[in-house]
């Protein structure tokens, strides 16, 4: 591929084509079909919702202006984590503050490519690109020209201009395959560049806390080093290493490739949260995806990990220890942004009320210092929120959007999930929000506090009755909700499978994480419920996003094909058949003569 033909001659005309395609899609009224294969849908919707306010679709390519660097950092995007920049921004900010002599730059070659070449969101390439249905089979991406274009035409362009010694990839559970595919191609073309991998996604590799045995690290000899745990100090040590065995052995938290064998060093202690510098996102402010997702909102991180252990959630496996910054440290960051004219913030924490007393103190200090801000973040429904004064405090401090793992309104389902199980308490929380929003009308707090709902459809012990309770609750409290952030058809992961089947001795017919049956539901039950949920969301007029439906539709299509094959296609065993006998296909197996023919289904 001639990269100059893509980047240089007429970028404006290509951007115009992107705008036209997106506008056609928006005008058509097409809704999000399945987020698992749709990276850009949300971005496009956000852009066009704001276009009337003067937001232009722009994206700056840094191929030409990037200077030589010691290391380039990138993360292959995945729709499940909109704040995917936070990890690599944290690494660069650490280097800038504590090791300014090192040159590190963040690049986003995949978004460069997708900006000019919007993918077929229901195509095979993008399905493979987002790690879901064929986990660990990264080589399947090599059947598609796009992965070569991304690696050689875009990532390679940065390498040739910046001449880095290192290329670092940050991985999450949904981008591992595309990362491996790109990293291998880069190593083959640029063998002198050291390939580094870090991020929470390393815990999915075969040695991790949430291991997938199919991710066999010893086969990834194109990777030079893996950072495990808090990566800031490990990353700095890697960049300063002379790459001798003695030097590499001395770096805690490092897993490194020694002539094809990976050596696991001792783990590194966690970094004190207040030692982390304020993340600097300035190098991304002219990035199409970043601008479209965040617009004028500033991402912040107040904590790492989560103190709870929801049955379906992997966060505690990735980050076992929950810890948070001091209130004063967070206030210092907020005040710094306010002085720069910023007032909208979104917290990338897994949970902002993991310590309710800490959040109460933060809110009180925000009010005390007169900070006029708006904050959104992930919130767990808790007993403290049954006190209406708590909700009033949150709103006065600027908390206006709670993304909450509501999941279900069934007590048995919530109990097995290890969620807040008091459904009457949940109702009281929503009633409190409704009351506070009503009493704030006509005041400076008139902008309502709203929930961004997360719902799981088809959990292990969810019956049709349980599911209907959830839909009824959503409809009843529609006025307290901004959107259905995620409505996910349930996928069964290995840890929960073992608990359900082997520890609890519950009935389970299991084929894979999509194709499983319990006493309460089947795969087709779950698919039917997600369709029913969508009908409800449309009827009550709430924005929504569906996750994992495509995987269930693929299963349905596969089962229908198998059924059709079993019913219609019967061939005659060639050993029994003679030259004089005709070849006959029987649609009805009962019509097959016996014993002359042996049934052989294909």
Predicted regions and their residues:
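Glycine-rich beta-alpha loop elements in corrinoid/cobalamin-binding modules
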Residues: 70, 94, 103, 144-267, ...
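Conserved Radical SAM active-site core
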Residues: 53, 97-100, 109-141, 145-164, ...
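Short beta-strand/loop segments at the ligand-binding rim of alpha/beta enzyme cores
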Residues: 190-199, 372-376, 449-451
């Amino acid at each position: 591929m001639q990269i100059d033909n893509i980047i240089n001659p007429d970028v404006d005309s290509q951007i115009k084509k992107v705008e036209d395609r997106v506008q056609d899609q928006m005008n058509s009224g097409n809704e999000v079909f399945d987020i698992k294969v749709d990276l850009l849908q949300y971005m496009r919707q956000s852009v066009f919702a704001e276009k009337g306010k003067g937001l232009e679709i722009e994206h700056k390519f840094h191929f030409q202006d990037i200077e030589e660097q010691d290391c380039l950092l990138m993360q292959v995007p995945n729709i499940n984590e909109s704040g995917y920049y936070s990890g690599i921004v944290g690494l660069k900010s650490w280097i800038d503050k504590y090791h300014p002599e090192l040159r590190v730059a963040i690049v986003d070659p995949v978004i460069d490519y997708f900006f000019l070449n919007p993918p077929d969101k229901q195509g095979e390439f993008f399905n493979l690109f987002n790690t879901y249905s064929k986990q660990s089979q990264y080589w399947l991406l090599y059947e598609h020209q796009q992965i070569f274009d991304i690696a050689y035409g875009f990532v390679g362009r940065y390498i040739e201009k910046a001449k880095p010694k290192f290329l670092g990839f940050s991985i999450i559970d949904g981008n591992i395959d595309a990362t491996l595919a790109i990293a291998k191609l880069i190593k083959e073309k640029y063998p002198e560049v050291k390939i580094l991998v870090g991020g929470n996604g390393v815990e999915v590799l075969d040695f991790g806390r949430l291991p997938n045995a199919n991710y066999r690290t010893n086969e990834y000899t194109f990777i030079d080093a893996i950072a495990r745990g808090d990566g800031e100090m490990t990353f700095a040590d890697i960049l300063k290493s002379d790459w001798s065995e003695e030097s590499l052995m001395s770096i805690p938290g490092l897993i490194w490739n020694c002539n094809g064998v990976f050596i696991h060093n001792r783990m590194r202690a966690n970094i004190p949260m207040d030692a982390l510098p304020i993340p600097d996102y300035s190098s991304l402010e002219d990035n199409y995806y970043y601008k479209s997702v965040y617009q004028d909102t500033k991402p912040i991180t107040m904590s790492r990990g989560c103190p709870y252990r929801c049955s379906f959630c992997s966060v505690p496996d990735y980050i076992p220890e929950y810890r948070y910054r001091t209130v004063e440290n967070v206030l210092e960051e907020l005040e710094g942004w306010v002085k720069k004219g910023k007032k909208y913030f979104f917290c990338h924490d897994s949970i902002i009320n993991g310590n309710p007393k800490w959040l109460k103190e933060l809110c009180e200090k925000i009010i005390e210092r007169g900070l006029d801000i708006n904050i959104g973040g992930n919130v767990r429904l808790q007993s403290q929120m049954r006190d209406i004064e708590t909700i009033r405090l949150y709103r006065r401090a600027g908390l206006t959007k709670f993304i909450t793992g509501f999941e279900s309104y069934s007590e048995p389902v919530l109990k097995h999930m290890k969620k807040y199980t008091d459904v009457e308490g949940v109702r009281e929380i929503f009633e409190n929000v409704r009351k506070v929003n009503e009493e704030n009308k006509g005041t400076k707090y008139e902008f309502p506090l709203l929930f961004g709902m997360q719902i799981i459809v088809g959990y292990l012990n969810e019956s049709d009755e349980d599911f209907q309770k959830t839909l009824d609750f959503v409809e009843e409290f529609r006025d307290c909700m901004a959107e259905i952030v995620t409505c996910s058809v349930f996928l069964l992961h290995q840890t929960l499978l073992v608990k359900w089947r082997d520890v609890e001795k519950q009935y389970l017919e299991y084929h894979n994480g999509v194709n499983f049956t319990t006493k309460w539901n089947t795969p087709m039950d779950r698919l039917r419920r997600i369709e029913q949920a969508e009908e409800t969301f449309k009827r009550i007029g709430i924005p929504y996003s569906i996750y994992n439906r495509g995987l269930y539709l693929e299963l349905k299509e596969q089962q229908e094909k198998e059924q059709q094959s079993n019913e219609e296609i019967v061939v005659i065993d060639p050993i029994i058949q003679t030259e004089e006998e005709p070849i006959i296909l029987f649609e009805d197996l009962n019509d097959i003569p016996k014993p002359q023919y042996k049934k052989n289904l294909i």
